[in-house]
Swiss-Prot record:
It is a multi-pass membrane protein. Disulfide bonds: none annotated. It holds the Pfam family DUF986. Keywords: Cell membrane, Membrane, Transmembrane, Transmembrane helix. The chain crosses the membrane at residues 8-28, 46-66, 70-90. One of its GO terms (cellular component) is plasma membrane. It comes from the Bacteria. This is UPF0266 membrane protein lin0773.
Length: 155
């Protein structure tokens, strides 16, 4: 394997992406106590995923067939492509509700820090903390009712 700057960058990016996947899918459900509710949310950036995976595919094809670059770079690009295909198309964003707070976008928000909640007409639950505004885009009305029931029970 050739360890030039490109391969080092791709290797670090692949490791960080794998750590993100493991944290999101394995660590969050197990940390901070029992999971009360896990709700899949509406996806909002589907086209971003298409563009990003398309760029990775173009880089792979360019490196493999046109530039005849190092094989190690092609392997690292292929691994990155597989990881991002999983992230963009198979994994969905979710809110994980625990007994003491909720996980959203990899961060934990205790129920005690929530100052205000608003519900929009199109099914968006807006949660305001002292520093941030979280927008939970529920997939269905039933999911929204489940989230509100958890908030009324545990906050």
């Amino acid at each position: 394997m050739v360890w030039d700057a490109t391969n080092i960058f791709l290797f670090i990016a692949n490791i960080l992406t794998l750590l993100y996947i493991l944290y999101n899918d394995a660590v969050i459900p197990l940390s901070k106590g029992k999971t009360v509710l896990s709700v899949k949310l509406r996806s909002r950036g589907r086209w971003d995923g298409y563009i990003f995976v398309g760029i990775i595919v173009l880089l792979f094809v360019s490196n493999t067939f046109f530039r005849e670059g190092p094989f190690s770079t092609s392997v690292l690009l292929a691994v990155m492509g597989v990881l991002f295909i999983y992230i963009c198309f198979f994994r969905s964003s979710k809110a994980v509700f625990k007994e003491t707070g909720l996980y959203y976008a990899l961060l934990f928000f205790p129920y005690a820090k929530i100052e205000r909640m608003n519900l929009s007409e199109d099914g968006v639950l807006v949660i305001e903390t002292n520093r941030q505004r979280l927008m939970l885009f529920a997939r269905s009305e039933k999911d929204l009712e489940k989230m509100l029931a958890v908030f009324t029970t545990y906050s």
